[in-house]
């Protein structure tokens, strides 16, 4: 596979990432900030199953800082997802470079406190989380495995946009 084939393969991967992120955001993530009545009982039950199965304290009892991240996901990221999916499925859209860099840096930045909380926070009954959350190191790693792709894929996107010669090259504009 040559450079063009590798680039197209990664563009398709990123296209699927952004396309898959739309239903995840709408149906699961935003339950933390949108009115409960917007969601049918089946989706609320699905989220509750996820919270119990993965012991996710951030969605069970979202702290204000986490709600602010969900709000940013609603206002800034969700509108970007279909645009990015289109650009990467179409391929060769150099105009996506700057928005993709902004998205990737923003997302990776939000994941640092999320991952730090899941790895280091006190989930005892005395904490903000009132005993909800992972109890063992294995449970923490299991939960982190859900969140870590949302750090790693934006990191791949960032490196792709910054280092790939195709996206890195600037078109020379003719002087009038």
Swiss-Prot record:
Cytoplasmic topology ranges: 1-9, 90-99, 163-176
Motif ER retention motif, chain ranges: 172-176
Pfam families linked to this entry: EBP
Residues holding cholesterol: 75, 77
Record family assignment: Belongs to the TMEM97/sigma-2 receptor family.
Transmembrane segments: 10-30, 69-89, 100-120, 142-162
A GO BP annotation: positive regulation of lipoprotein transport
MF terms in GO: cholesterol binding; oxysterol binding
Subcellular location: Rough endoplasmic reticulum membrane; Nucleus membrane
Function comment: Sigma-2 receptor which contributes to ameliorate dysfunctional cellular processes and slow degenerative progression by regulating cell functions including cholesterol biosynthesis/trafficking, membrane trafficking, autophagy, lipid membrane-bound protein trafficking, and receptor stabilization at the cell surface. Forms a ternary complex with PGRMC1 receptor and low density lipoprotein receptor/LDLR at the plasma membrane, which increases LDLR-mediated LDL cholesterol internalization.
Record topological domains on the Lumenal side: 31-68, 121-141
Other remarks in the entry: Sigma receptors are classified into two subtypes (Sigma-1 and Sigma-2) based on their different pharmacological profile. Sigma-2 receptors are identified by radioligand-binding studies as a binding site with high affinity for di-o-tolylguanidine (DTG) and haloperidol. Binds chemotype ligands that display antiallodynic effect.
Gene: TMEM97
Sites marked Important for 20(S)-OHC binding and stereoselectivity: 150
Complex formation: Homodimer. Interacts with NPC1; the interaction impairs NPC1-mediated cholesterol transport. Interacts with PGRMC1 and LDLR; the interaction increases LDL internalization. Interacts with histatin 1/HTN1; the interaction induces HTN1-stimulating wound healing. Interacts with TSPO.
Originating species: Bos taurus (Bovine)
Residue(s) at site: Likely important for receptor folding: 56
Protein name, entry field: Sigma intracellular receptor 2
InterPro entries registered for this protein in UniProt: EXPERA, Sigma-2_receptor-like, Sigma2_recept
């Amino acid at each position: 596979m040559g450079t063009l084939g590798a680039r197209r393969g990664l563009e398709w991967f990123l296209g699927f990432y952004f396309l898959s992120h739309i239903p995840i955001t709408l149906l699961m993530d935003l339950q933390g900030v949108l009115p409960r009545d917007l969601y049918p009982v089946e989706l609320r039950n699905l989220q509750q199953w996820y919270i119990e199965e993965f012991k996710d304290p951030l969605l069970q009892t979202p702290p204000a800082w986490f709600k602010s991240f969900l709000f940013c996901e609603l206002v800034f990221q969700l509108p970007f997802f279909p645009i990015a999916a289109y650009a990467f499925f179409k391929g060769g859209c150099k105009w996506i470079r700057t928005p993709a860099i902004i998205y990737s840096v923003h997302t990776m930045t939000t994941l640092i406190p999320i991952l730090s909380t899941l790895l280091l926070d006190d989930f005892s009954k005395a904490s903000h989380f009132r005993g909800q959350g992972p109890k063992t190191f294995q449970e923490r790693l299991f939960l982190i495995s859900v969140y870590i792709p949302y750090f790693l894929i934006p990191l791949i996107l960032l490196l792709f946009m910054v280092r790939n010669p195709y996206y890195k090259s600037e078109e020379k504009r003719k002087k009038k």
